[in-house]
A protein has these predicted regions:
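Short, solvent-exposed loop/linker segments at the N-terminal edge
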Residues: 45-51, 117-123, 191-198, 270-276
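Proline-enriched interdomain boundary motifs that mark the N-terminal boundary
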Residues: 36-44, 107-115, 182-190, 261-268
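Interdomain boundary/hinge segments at the C-termini of tandem beta-sandwich modules
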Residues: 31-35, 100-106, 176-182, 255-261
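Short, exposed coil/turn segments at beta-strand boundaries within extracellular/luminal domains
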Residues: 21-28, 91-97, 120, 168-175, ...
């Protein structure tokens, strides 16, 4: 369109502009109107807090981002969800704009909800995340497994650690380390007779334990010696549970200990002549 000599482009193409003076003389001019360029800044992106995003424009002659950058691609690290504006200029000097939004998601924070992050074999701990939704995983299922935030310690021979990770639906992660103490094993003679020998039990074939770490569930069957670690004193017939609790980790282990009654001795009266002899025979009662 033309108004008072000012030509305004309406759509792309060529237009002939004619001027006629008061004497009837005319002059013409062909005006070319270039279309606006198509400018894009890429699809909206979602990042985790503390991460960065790369924004890339469609190919233009000149670029002007709202950040002040003038390159085709820029890297941004917003702390909150932010929309970025872009002005692109083509070879004809025509400009157009575009926008792209970078959504920022919080990082999950993982903590112990119930229990402790240091576990004995078979124990559990419940974890929680500050972000809802998502999945849990363990770096080593042979050390600890996790389901719904509940971690279960597996059997290990030495103190071991596993990293438990929570991954949100936005693929943002938070983690915590759990420690699993080694499984203990009681070994030695697990039977005795009332009045008989007093066996000494071992932990993982190691005698360096303390007497206070041992206990018996039934003092009427057997007690533990107060001064000698692992020494069991049979008291009466029956079965008792012997427990060893590690002084450092507080992890317990148990074993059944059986005590049998002492054999009974019975005799009959037999008369012999003076200077005679008698053969005595002992027969076990059981």
């Amino acid at each position: 369109t033309v108004l008072n000599g000012v030509v305004t482009g309406v759509s792309d193409g060529d237009a002939t502009i004619t001027y006629k003076n008061n004497k009837g003389c005319t002059v013409t001019k062909i005006v070319t109107v270039n279309g606006l360029p198509t400018v894009t800044a890429g699809a909206d992106q979602t990042i985790c807090s503390g991460s960065s995003a790369t924004l890339t424009s469609s190919t233009m002659s000149f670029y002007n981002w709202g950040t002040g950058a003038t390159t085709q691609s820029i890297t941004v690290s917003p702390t909150t969800t932010t929309t970025y504006a872009l002005t692109g200029t083509d070879a004809n000097g025509c400009e157009n704009t575009a926008q792209v939004t970078v959504n920022v998601q919080d990082l999950p924070s993982v903590s112990v909800s119930t229990g402790s992050s240091t576990l004995c074999v078979g124990e559990t701990v419940t974890l929680s995340s500050t972000v809802s939704g998502g999945t849990w995983s363990s770096s080593d299922n042979s050390i600890a497994t996790v389901s719904g935030g509940v971690v279960t310690a597996k059997s290990v021979s030495t103190q071991s650690t596993a990293t438990i990770t929570f991954t949100s639906t936005a693929n943002c992660t938070g983690s915590i380390t759990v420690t699993v103490n080694p499984e203990l094993t009681i070994s030695g003679t697990m039977t005795a007779t009332v009045g008989g020998s007093q066996p000494v039990l071992l932990i993982n074939a190691n005698t360096t334990t303390t007497a206070s770490s041992w206990s018996s569930s039934d003092q009427n069957v057997a007690t533990v010696d107060a001064t000698t670690a692992g020494k069991i004193v049979p008291v009466g017939p029956g079965t008792t549970t012997i427990t060893y609790t590690d002084a450092t980790t507080s992890c317990p282990t148990t074993a059944l200990f059986t005590v049998s009654a002492a054999p009974s001795i019975t005799s009959t009266t037999t008369e012999v002549c003076e200077d005679g002899s008698l053969t005595l025979t002992a027969t076990p009662s059981g």
